[in-house]
Regions:
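Conserved helicase RecA-like core
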Residues: 1-149
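Basic Arg/Gly/Lys-rich low-complexity intrinsically disordered segments
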Residues: 57, 128, 137, 141-179
């Protein structure tokens, strides 16, 4: 949430790996004053189209999505992409962050890496894209370290456009455990 506020997000797609996490994240964001819609494969086609249209029309600034939104969606002027979960397939990362900065426009992408598995997947992504992903570490909402590689145990990774790390994904009592 702090990143959303700090970045002055106009509109953003926030990717989660599991539908259950999408629902939990929407509840958490809503409790903290954010407006968001879901987009995932278990929704009917009409529900997906309605959610997407509300997002494109600017009625709702945040779309919390599964990888169903990572390919084939062209959202003009998308300011940010957040990977709430690091994708387990490096190619999915490339497709996710490709939703922003399209058609010569600028955009920013952030990936929250909070586990050893996340760091492992980041390594696969860096190998695929043939470059290191800049990292910054945030503790209690403050940047404590930034650079190409962080020695912190839970760095947050960016795609080279920007980066951030939350000490925990949410501070709500129901925060999800990702597997």
């Amino acid at each position: 949430r702090d990143i959303l506020r700090h970045e002055a997000v106009k509109n953003a797609v926030i990717f989660c790996n599991r539908k259950r996490d999408i629902a939990e994240l929407i509840k958490s964001l809503t409790r903290h004053g954010f407006s968001a819609v879901a987009l995932h494969g278990d929704m009917t086609q009409s529900a997906r189209l309605e959610a997407l249209q509300r997002f494109k029309d600017g009625e709702v600034p945040l779309m919390i999505a599964s990888d169903v939104a990572a390919r084939g969606l062209d959202i003009a002027g998308l300011s940010h992409v957040f990977n709430f979960d690091v994708p387990s397939h490096a190619e999915d990362y490339v497709h996710r962050i490709g939703r922003t900065g399209r058609a010569g426009k600028s955009g920013r992408a952030f990936t929250i890496a909070a586990s050893k598995d996340d760091i492992k997947y980041i390594g696969f992504i860096e190998k695929l894209i043939s470059k290191p992903i800049p990292q910054i570490t945030v503790v209690d909402g403050r940047v404590v370290e930034s650079g190409a590689k962080s020695s912190a145990s839970k760095p947050t990774i960016s795609d080279g456009k920007a980066g951030a790390k939350a000490d925990a994904k949410t501070d709500d009592s129901h925060a999800s455990e990702n597997s």
